[in-house]
């Protein structure tokens, strides 16, 4: 597995995370502040908002033919609050201000009850769900489908050229692009 580590300055990575995880869904710093303030209505020691988008793509070639391809996008928001030794956590696959505030209220209620719990909130359709969600520097997007198939064919040709006894070649390529943004009361901590 090859990991691509971005060497871009943190500010640029933050801007990319905001462009992928906040802006398409109409979320702003004010939205994050409202959610954190909602959690803070109960006495808590710590709270954070965790946004994540993961894109996966895979291709496989067998006997000179592309046999399968896969593509998936998983995204959502999680809200966590810590009160004493208890942790409350709520999450949703929907990234929207309504889902964020629902999760914040749920976490506040759990924390106020003195329990440690995890709650998955229901999915709501999102206006941005049909939009293009990938940052221009997404490494998966650096090659189009034709180029990915050509890469697999090149691997097959190279393998067969090494030894005439090679009668079957199976090749695959898979990639995953993950973007995370964590917001805390004192400001964003990680991208």
What spans do the regions from the language model cover?
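Active-site bordering "gate/hinge" segments
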Residues: 1-190
